């Protein structure tokens, strides 16, 4: 839940610098949201060790991708419906399982389809805000459904941690 206000601040900052493409937010973000919803309910059914293993493998693969990623010389802006659906569902699903905003995946994807680095980063931040909101709702609802009974929590959201860390994360 802490990611919601920090993502909101990030989007606002990128928006002020004209680095958010709202077209990609609408046309791609909807598929990311579906992936987040599926992922948050799936994550609630997994054991902690499974999530740790999944997180480790995905981080390793993402690191390899960043190491070997090559810049495109010709930029052709084309983000087909198939690409938006495929990447959106995967990014949303993986982001919710890992508890991340998805920029580590969305920036390379948006660069791959031809967005400038500034638009890729700003648009990835705006998509991260969608991931934050729907991930938070998904973990809230799935935690209530499976009756987590975690003290001082609603679903998987710990209220004291949320209240303590919000001021710290927004200031930074």
Where is each model-derived feature located?
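Transmembrane helix-bundle signature of multi-pass membrane transporters/permeases
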Residues: 1-3, 124-132
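Juxtamembrane transmembrane-helix boundary motif
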Residues: 7-92, 97, 109-119, 129, ...
């Amino acid at each position: 839940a802490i990611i919601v206000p920090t993502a909101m601040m990030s989007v606002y900052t990128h928006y002020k610098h004209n680095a958010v493409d709202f077209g990609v937010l609408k046309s791609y973000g909807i598929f990311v949201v579906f992936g987040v919803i599926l992922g948050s309910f799936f994550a609630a059914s997994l054991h902690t060790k499974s999530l740790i293993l999944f997180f480790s493998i995905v981080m390793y693969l993402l690191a390899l991708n960043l190491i070997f990623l090559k810049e495109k010389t010709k930029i052709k802006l084309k983000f087909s419906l198939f690409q938006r659906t495929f990447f959106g569902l995967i990014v949303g699903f993986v982001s919710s399982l890992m508890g991340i905003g998805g920029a580590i995946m969305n920036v390379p994807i948006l660069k791959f389809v031809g967005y400038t680095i500034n638009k890729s980063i700003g648009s990835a931040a705006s998509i991260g805000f969608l991931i934050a909101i729907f991930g938070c709702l998904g973990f809230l609802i799935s935690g209530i459904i499976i009756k987590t009974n975690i003290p001082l929590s609603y679903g998987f959201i710990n209220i004291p941690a949320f209240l303590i860390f919000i001021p710290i994360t927004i200031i930074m």
